[in-house]
Design a protein with these regions (language model features):
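Boundary/entry segment of secreted carbohydrate-active catalytic domains
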Residues: 1-32, 37, 43
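Hydrophobic faces of well-ordered beta-strands that scaffold small-molecule active sites
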Residues: 7-13, 38-42, 75-79, 135-139, ...
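Short, acidic/polar
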Residues: 18-34, 118-126, 186-198, 272-282
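Substrate-binding cleft of secreted/luminal carbohydrate-active enzymes
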Residues: 76, 244-322
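Active-site groove signature of glycoside hydrolases
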Residues: 82, 87, 107-114, 118-152, ...
């Protein structure tokens, strides 16, 4: 079992989510720094960096990486077509005009032009940051999953292998993180093969864990006992494979039906600070380490509304593990 004092905590920071919430990303990030996270996952958004074909703008990501370096925060960098936050696939408009970015009958990388341009973008990001202290490179987000939030669009295992090969060529000692979703329905075994494929490709596997997922405006799906047993078994398999077992998208913000950001009120049924603390403790007892909380931009938004319940809960979170 993970000794609680050795548990490492982190979060994912998304400048895109700041935009959705109407917040300045620099000011928001500076509110996150005092929380003293061990890790922060950053996102290399294709549509932000290469708005115009062949012209790359790294101003935002450069600033975020510099801030992490300044404050000795370990960096996880997510890169690819598919990176954290809606709409999952972050295509520049010029790509959407020349490629099929909505198909579900085949993998998106089946479009040779799209695959070629994506690899050019990934290579640019790798070369930009290959000498920076990136502790893990995340290739795509839920790289092999066909999740509903991405409208069933997906990438092939072969394309993920190409991206990893490209990274290893330029950063031979790089460590690879692949993220996986876990199904809440016991009869759906599709995540098992994806999990095993990911183990073969990565140094660390990050599981995205939610405990209340909306099915309509009033009802939520909650994990059954098999869900926790599967998480325990997956951890055992990762340990036996000498891979790191991370929890990388751990619910710490509301997820509500048909809401890009849930900001109509300050409290929702899908989560709470108390539920978040319970989830972190449960994952720690299952030996997942580090644990990256999902929703730091939301906590800052809450603070701006005069409510400190999330910021205070996160601030206190590390004390039991100190």
């Amino acid at each position: 079992m993970v000794k609680l004092h050795s548990l490492k905590l982190g979060t994912t920071f998304s400048q895109l989510q700041c935009h959705y919430l109407g917040m300045d990303y620099k000011k928001t990030f500076k509110e996150i720094i005092p929380l003293n996270f061990d890790y922060i996952r950053l996102c290399a958004y294709w549509n932000e960096i290469e708005k115009i074909k062949g012209k790359f703008n790294f101003i935002v990501l450069d600033w975020l990486i510099k801030q992490c370096e300044k404050h000795s925060i370990k960096i996880v960098l997510a890169v690819g077509m598919k990176t954290p936050r809606w709409p999952e696939f972050h295509f520049p408009k010029w790509i959407e005009e020349i490629c099929n970015t909505t198909r579900t009958d085949k993998s998106l990388d089946n479009d040779e032009k799209l695959a070629e341009q994506a690899l050019i973008f990934v290579k640019k990001v790798i070369k930009r940051y290959k000498n920076r202290p990136i502790c893990y490179w995340q290739i795509e987000n839920e790289a092999l999953n066909k999740v509903g939030v991405a409208n069933r669009r997906y990438l092939s295992k072969e394309f993920i292998e190409k991206e990893i090969k490209l990274l290893k060529k330029h950063v031979p000692k790089s460590k690879i993180l692949l993220t996986n979703s876990i199904n809440m329905f016991p009869l759906d075994k599709s995540d098992e093969k994806i999990f095993k494929d990911s183990i073969a490709l990565a140094d660390a596997i990050g599981i995205n864990v939610y405990t209340k997922v909306p099915i309509n405006s009033k009802h939520y799906i909650k994990p059954l006992p098999f869900f926790w047993k599967k998480l325990a078994r997956w951890h055992k398999e990762l340990t036996e494979s000498k891979k790191q077992a991370w929890a990388v998208e751990v619910q710490a913000e509301p997820w509500e039906h048909n809401k890009l950001v849930a900001v109509d009120k300050l409290e929702y049924l899908s989560t709470s600070p108390k539920a978040m603390l319970k989830l972190v403790n449960r994952l720690a007892k299952l030996n997942y380490n580090p644990i990256l909380l999902w929703g730091c931009e939301y906590w800052v938004w809450h603070k701006q509304q005069g409510s400190l319940i999330w910021i205070e809960a996160i601030s206190k979170l590390k004390k039991p593990f100190a």
